[in-house]
Amino acid sequence: MAIILGADAHGNALKELIKSFLQEEGYDIIDVTDINSDFIDNTLAVAKAVNEAEGRLGIMVDAYGAGPFMVATKLKGMVAAEVSDERSAYMTRGHNNARMITIGAEIVGPELAKNIVKGFVTGPYDGGRHQIRVDMLNKMA
């Protein structure tokens, strides 16, 4: 599974920590960060790369996570979540089939970020009754 990473200048240090953690865990990483671009361009790069192939997940880091969440959810086929805790990261995979999360580096510290990422990338999609909501989300954008 490939994990697409992106960050703006405010999130780059935490993104690098996440990148190292995921590489140590054996994941293939594609880092699309352009440090000279703002969160909008970097979020679009992550979301588009995730949508290019099945089985990809994305993680975007900026200062607060809210802006990238708003950008990502504008793209057709993208279900994204802004997360700042492990349980939400895990559950958004299980119930929403989220393919991307956004994290705020000024909200989430290094150890919590690792736990969030681990929950997200290892969380299975439950399907079943949850697919109805996923289909509804996909019809919206």
Curated annotation (Swiss-Prot):
This protein's source sits in the domain of life called Bacteria
Q: Which Pfam families match?
A: LacAB_rpiB
**Could you tell me which pathway this protein works in?**
Carbohydrate metabolism; D-galactose 6-phosphate degradation; D-tagatose 6-phosphate from D-galactose 6-phosphate: step 1/1
Q: Name one GO molecular function term.
A: galactose-6-phosphate isomerase activity
Q: Which reaction does it catalyse?
A: aldehydo-D-galactose 6-phosphate = keto-D-tagatose 6-phosphate
Q: What keywords are annotated for this sequence in UniProt?
A: Isomerase, Lactose metabolism
GO BP field: D-allose catabolic process; galactose catabolic process; lactose catabolic process via tagatose-6-phosphate; pentose-phosphate shunt, non-oxidative branch
User: What is the E.C. number?
Assistant: 5.3.1.26
> What residue stretch is flagged as signal peptide?
none
- Enzyme class, first EC level, given as a word: isomerase
Quaternary data: Heteromultimeric protein consisting of LacA and LacB.
UniProt record similarity statement = Belongs to the LacAB/RpiB family.
The molecule here is called Galactose-6-phosphate isomerase subunit LacA 1
Q: What is the lineage of its organism?
A: Bacteria, Bacillati, Bacillota, Bacilli, Lactobacillales
